[in-house]
Structures are given as structure tokens and as C-alpha cells.
Amino acid sequence: MSAIRRRWRFTGTVQGVGFRYYARAAALHLGLTGWVANNWDGSVTLEAQGERAALDALVPLIERSNRWARIENVEVTPLP
């Protein structure tokens, strides 16, 4: 299987609550590579690459892992 890439933009209470730490831990647990960063507007952007099943499992794992974050909206963009 070939790797695919996606970018997510999370809004809500996602800064100052360990969101990037838990997102990175979840991605590593699933065997994904990529990056995560805070944005000036209070949102967080995450880009990851890997197998489709792992990418599909990433957001639910982040939501279960971090009890302090409150994700209000997620925008997903497939990348080439």
C-alpha cells in the first residue's frame, strides 16, 4: 500500500491544553509521520502521512486521549 497525506485544521479549545503533544503521540502510535503547529488564530494545523486506516484513526484517538481539548470543528484536506 502507498502512503497518503492529509492536513487537518482544528478549532475550539485546542491551544494551551496539550493538544499538540497528544496529537504527536497519537500519530507516532499509529506509525504516521508529519507535523503539528499552533496557528495565530487559535487553531491548530496537523499534517500527517501514512496508511489510510491509520489516518482515519488519528482524530478519534486524539479526541479520546486529551480530556482538556474541546474540538469544535475539523477541516480535512487531502494532499497530493
For each predicted feature, which ranges?
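Intrinsically disordered, low-complexity, mixed-charge
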Residues: 1-80
